[in-house]
A protein has these predicted regions:
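Assembly/interface hotspot detector across virion components, adhesins/toxins, and nucleic-acid enzymes
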Residues: 3, 19-21, 45-47, 55-59, ...
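Acidic, low-complexity, intrinsically disordered interaction modules
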Residues: 26-65
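Short, compact, well-ordered microdomains
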Residues: 60-82
């Protein structure tokens, strides 16, 4: 998936307070949680998008980080908090 498309989707999720589920080619799933209502997943503090290296870095409030190659992303699903 193109990094600029990913950037637009994740920025919308941040602004709107959504949960975004990122599905990778190998079947793994990662979550970006900007919702204040969904407590099932750790809240996301920030996202860093490195367009040059096609790298998405998800930084959670508990200090954990996910590093994802944007070329391995096949689907992003977002939904409002319940």
């Amino acid at each position: 998936m193109k990094i600029d498309v990913i950037k637009n989707i994740l920025e919308d999720a941040k602004v709107c307070g959504l949960l975004a589920t990122i599905t990778l080619v190998n079947g793994q799933v990662s979550h970006v949680n900007f919702s204040k209502h969904i407590k099932t997943f750790t809240a996301t503090d920030d996202i860093i998008l490195d367009e040059e290296r096609h790298l998405v870095t998800i930084i959670d409030t508990d200090g954990s980080r996910d590093y994802i190659d944007s070329d391995s992303i096949i689907r992003i699903f977002s939904k409002e908090g319940l």
